[in-house]
Regions:
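Rossmann-like S-adenosyl-L-methionine
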Residues: 2-21, 235-469
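Extended interfacial segments that mediate partner engagement and assembly in macromolecular machines
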Residues: 62-74, 80-202
């Protein structure tokens, strides 16, 4: 028996009052929360509901009754379809205000701890072309916008090189210009597409798993170096060679050119070996006179300039003294560890990924830093009381965990080690708030500084300074 199609209501004159979790705009209708994308506080809209849950509904705008005075003009032609920069229609100052409010709300509501005045979110000097890394997907058929479908024109089955439609693994929006990464990123992507189309290269189909061209990663450094990694679905050596030779000739600024053959059904390449086809096996980033080696698999903050501001906040909060021992937990490739090393006696870094630890050691060597020591392994297994006894009790601990936050046993070890200060850097204030509550018996929050690493998105980093009570 066919399932009866739900008959959802049309909500007229809904006032959008605020931005909620994950950057969703919301209003209330009959005391029920209604989430509406692509709106801003102050908009009054007619909304067609498309889904209902027990505590909320979701819908889309069918008519703007009144547009908010806060509304800004989106600068990207793909806004509203691409999921990359959903806050383009909100002035940047308002974005920062909402991010500050988001941090305050989550630390207060989830952490339930005493807080000082939260500093205004530190804005990014660049709000366009600020990313140093983008990954593009090849698809045999591009996603058609509603306007294209309704135009009834000849739209054909053209392929795409761009980004996935949010929530749709097999749908790709063809990107003509992206405002996230500086040149030559747009040129490389467009030229790769042109060459492949004109020379009969097949583009990947995520459902049938056919088609040679899969992905392309472009990394740009503040030093001017450029890395390109092209991912193919099979080892078609003549076509691989022809494309890479063409890109190398067309863009002499590419200093590192790699390819990967990925025959798996998913796009992850972390377990595959990149082949250096031409140039160096890395690019170099610079920060305050330090040089950082970035390989094809290396993690590096994707907003280089704002990463510097973030790390300066963390270092200032750490307030290191001569003779101090610093523990940098979840150290990644050791960027913070090396950034702080000159201000203390020694730094101990721990990270789960062995390749990241290898990069951290290389970066210390590259900069002539001799007072760092790095360990690879699961944080819960590596950091215990015996580890602290062997490496020295930390005077300061910097935490920079993944979104899931810090495991409770790790917090227990930190509490027993009793550093005089903890600096907690987080990309997820919700889990940060949970962890701060666990530290609250022994440490009080002295300062809170949100940092905007990703303009025009809801994402916010937050740095908290804790001192012993």
């Amino acid at each position: 028996m066919a399932r009866k199609k739900a008959n959802y209501p049309l909500v007229e004159g809904l006032e959008i009052t605020t931005l909620a979790a994950e950057g969703k705009a919301m209003g209330r209708w009959n005391d029920v929360v209604v989430f509406v994308p692509l709106t801003v506080p102050g908009d009054v809209v007619d909304v067609q509901i498309r889904s209902k849950r027990r505590r909320f509904m979701e819908g889309f705008v069918v008519r703007y009754v009144k547009k908010s005075p806060l509304r800004a003009e989106a600068f990207c032609e793909h806004f509203g379809v691409c999921g990359g920069c959903k806050w383009q229609n909100l002035p940047y100052g308002e974005q920062l205000r909402f991010k500050t409010d988001q941090v305050r709300d989550q630390l207060t509501r989830i952490g339930k701890i005493e807080l000082p005045e939260i500093a205004p979110c530190l804005g990014s000097a660049e709000t366009q072309f600020y990313r140093n890394k983008l990954e593009f997907t090849f698809a045999d058929r591009r996603w058609l916008t509603r306007e294209e479908i309704e135009s009834a024109g000849d739209i054909g089955d053209a392929p795409a090189v761009g980004f996935h439609i949010p929530g749709m693994f097999d749908k790709v929006l063809d990107i003509r210009k992206c405002w996230l990464q500086p040149d030559p990123s747009n040129g490389i992507r467009m030229e790769a597409k042109r060459f492949c189309v004109e020379n009969g290269y097949t583009f990947h189909n995520a459902r049938s798993h056919e088609g040679l061209m899969r992905n392309m990663i472009v990394r740009t450094a503040s030093t001017g170096e450029v890395m390109v990694i092209v991912v193919f679905n099979s080892d078609d050596r003549p076509r691989i060679t022809a494309l890479l030779d063409h890109l190398s000739a067309a863009f002499p600024e590419i200093t590192s050119l790699f390819y990967i053959v990925n025959t798996k059904f998913n796009d992850s390449v972390g377990d595959l070996d990149p082949v250096c086809y031409r140039g160096k096996d890395h690019i170099i980033e610079e920060m305050e006179g330090l040089r950082f080696k970035v390989g094809p698999k290396s993690f590096y903050q994707t907003n280089s300039a704002q990463a510097y501001e973030l790390y300066k906040v963390a270092r200032d909060f750490a307030d290191l003294k001569p003779g101090d021992i610093l523990y940098d937990l979840y150290t990644g490739t050791g960027t913070i560890a090396n950034f702080c090393a000159a201000r203390c006696d020694r730094v101990v870094g721990i990270e789960y990924v062995p390749e990241a630890i290898a990069d951290a050691e290389i970066n210390s060597e590259l900069n002539g830093i001799g007072n760092t020591r790095f360990y690879a392994g699961d944080m819960k297994a590596v950091l215990d009381d015996a580890f602290v006894a062997a490496n020295g009790r930390p005077d300061v601990v910097i935490l920079d965990p993944p979104r899931a936050g810090v495991d409770e046993p790790v917090i227990g070890v930190i509490l027993r080690a009793a550093p005089r200060r903890i600096v907690y850097v987080s990309c997820n204030p919700a889990t940060q708030a949970r962890d701060l509550a666990l530290l609250d018996a022994e440490y009080r929050v002295e300062a809170v500084q949100p940092v905007d690493m990703f303009p025009h998105t809801h994402h916010v980093e937050n740095v908290v300074k804790l001192v012993r009570r």
